[in-house]
């Protein structure tokens, strides 16, 4: 399963661990993804999505109906 936020599109990114002696080793920065259930009043059902915490804040701000409409317009099956 991919580590991608359904709402924001956040993905893992690469970087370095840097020690006190400035030795660098490669690492991945993973997005803070959560499985979250949202109640969709217009459809009278729960929708379970894998979203980042920023995606949850976006849904709180815009509303789940607007976000779902944007995802469906982009061809996402929900």
From Swiss-Prot:
Recorded GO CC terms? cytosolic large ribosomal subunit
**Transmembrane stretches, by residue range?**
none
UniProt cross-references to InterPro entries, sorted A to Z: Ribosomal_bL28 (IPR026569), Ribosomal_bL28/bL31-like_sf (IPR034704), Ribosomal_bL28_bact-type (IPR001383), Ribosomal_bL28_sf (IPR037147)
The record's keywords, sorted A to Z, are: Ribonucleoprotein, Ribosomal protein
**Single annotated GO MF:** structural constituent of ribosome
Q: Which SUPFAM superfamilies match?
A: L28p-like
Concerning Gene3D superfamilies, the annotation shows:
Ribosomal protein L28/L24 (2.30.170.40)
Biological process (GO) annotations held by this record are: translation
Q: Which family does it belong to?
A: Belongs to the bacterial ribosomal protein bL28 family.
What's the protein here called?
Answer: Large ribosomal subunit protein bL28
């Amino acid at each position: 399963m991919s580590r991608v936020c359904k709402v924001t599109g956040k993905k893992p990114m690469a970087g370095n661990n840097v020690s006190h002696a400035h030795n660098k080793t490669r690492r991945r920065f993973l997005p803070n993804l959560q499985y979250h259930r949202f109640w969709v009043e217009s459809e009278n059902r729960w929708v379970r999505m894998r979203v980042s915490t920023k995606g949850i804040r976006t849904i709180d701000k815009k509303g789940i109906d607007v976000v779902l409409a944007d995802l469906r317009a982009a061809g996402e099956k929900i």
